[in-house]
């Protein structure tokens, strides 16, 4: 595999860590800037919302920009925003700087995946996407904990300084390793871009990803209350569950990439989503038989953690294949759908927890996974019909 692929992995790791890392330094940041922790938490919200809204717009507006230049400029803006965040005394200014950093991430993240897929050998598209996606799971498993440790040891401003330094190193790696282009990417006119993106197989696939993420994040967001209700697990055991799920996610995303190349996206998704449904039903059964044996719950949660990330390479490889010359724009919309699913999942999970208790969470999540499977079946049917018409 090429050196530039690992530079893009590092870029994904840094960009996603920057989104989530604030969660670990909220108390210190809020106290220093004179705001409540709830207000400080909006720094995470505004970053995620900005990425979700800006990613498709940036993908269309910057479609013809040489990728090497796009990544370099965006990462430079990212570095500057984090360096400034490390020294600002104002919460309002920090909020603006988070929006600036989010714009940089929005213009870069989908393009990174599209670049990896476009420059991968045909038989290794899934694996190339999986390598970059390891940066996403790695940010959750390692980036956020390390950023939190830096903040607790040296102050919250040191976390932003560390992000700026990491961004600068990634900028250097990308600029050195990424191949030069002879000219701008050939991109269809806007009307043709919208026509391609509006095809039913693509729209249904995008919706399926959003629905699948809604169910997955519903369970992940409220996994701690589930463990507390279904088992006798304490804080340490709950932390172990999250750690095992995170490690399984790293393994799952790599195996999902290999499966995509060997089985194809559709079979990979059928297996992955089917496994999610099975683990959700198992978690419900364990809750119904509470107190459930902790080792069994740990095993099921670990399998679920792996399967939750298994599907990502297949979803993106499928969109890349269907969207062709506008795969970057399709993956940007997929990024928006992912963030939307995260938000909806947390909200609906809270409603399910309040209205029906912990036991409703795994069954509701299983329902969303089945819904995603149905949407993907319709998407495949629509794609088959389109090819027959040709």
Predicted regions and their residues:
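Helix-breaking motifs and short loop linkers at transmembrane-helix boundaries and internal kinks
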Residues: 32-34, 66, 87-93, 232, ...
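Conserved MFS/SLC helix-loop-helix module at the cytosolic interface between two early adjacent transmembrane helices
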Residues: 53-89
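Primarily marks hydrophobic transmembrane alpha-helices of the MFS/SLC 12-helix fold
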Residues: 68-71, 94, 269
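Helix-loop-helix hairpin linking two adjacent transmembrane segments in secondary transporters
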Residues: 91-93, 121-179, 226
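Cytoplasmic helix-loop-helix junction between adjacent transmembrane helices
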Residues: 97-136
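Helix-to-loop junctions at the C-terminal end of transmembrane segments
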Residues: 54-67, 252-265, 353
């Amino acid at each position: 595999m090429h050196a530039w692929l690992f530079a893009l992995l590092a870029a994904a790791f840094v960009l996603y860590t920057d989104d989530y890392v604030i969660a670990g330094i909220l108390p210190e940041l809020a106290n220093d800037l004179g705001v409540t922790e709830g207000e400080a938490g909006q720094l995470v919200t505004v970053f995620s919302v900005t990425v979700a809204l800006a990613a498709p717009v940036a993908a269309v507006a910057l479609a013809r920009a040489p990728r090497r230049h796009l990544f370099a400029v965006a990462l430079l803006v990212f570095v500057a925003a984090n360096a400034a965040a490390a020294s600002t005394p104002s919460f309002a200014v920090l909020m603006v700087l988070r929006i600036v950093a989010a714009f940089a991430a929005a213009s870069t993240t989908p393009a990174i995946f599209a670049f990896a897929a476009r420059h991968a050998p045909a038989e290794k598209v899934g694996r190339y996407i999986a390598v970059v996606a390891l940066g996403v799971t790695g940010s959750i498993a390692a980036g956020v904990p390390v950023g939190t440790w830096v903040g607790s040891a040296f102050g919250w401003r040191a976390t932003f300084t560390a992000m700026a330094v990491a961004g600068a190193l990634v900028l250097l790696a990308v600029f050195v390793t990424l191949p030069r282009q002879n000219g701008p990417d050939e991109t269809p006119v806007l009307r043709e871009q919208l026509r391609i993106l509006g095809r039913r197989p693509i729209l249904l696939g995008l919706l399926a990803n959003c629905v699948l993420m809604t169910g997955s994040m519903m369970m992940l967001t409220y996994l701690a209350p589930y463990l507390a209700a279904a088992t006798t697990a304490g804080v340490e055991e709950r932390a172990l569950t999250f750690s095992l799920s995170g490690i399984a996610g790293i393994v799952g995303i790599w195996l999902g990439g290999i499966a995509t190349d060997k089985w194809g996206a559709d079979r990979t998704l059928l297996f992955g989503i089917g496994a999610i449904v099975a683990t959700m039903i198992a978690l419900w059964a364990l809750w119904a038989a509470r107190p459930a044996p902790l080792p069994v719950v740990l095993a099921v949660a670990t399998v679920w953690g792996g399967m939750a990330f298994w599907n990502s390479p297949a979803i993106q490889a499928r969109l890349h294949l269907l969207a062709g010359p506008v795969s970057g724009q399709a993956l940007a919309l997929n990024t928006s759908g992912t963030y939307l699913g995260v938000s909806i999942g947390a909200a609906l999970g809270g409603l399910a927890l309040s209205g029906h208790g912990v036991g409703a969470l795994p069954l509701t999540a299983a329902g969303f996974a089945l819904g995603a499977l149905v949407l993907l079946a319709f998407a495949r049917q629509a794609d088959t019909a389109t090819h027959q018409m040709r």
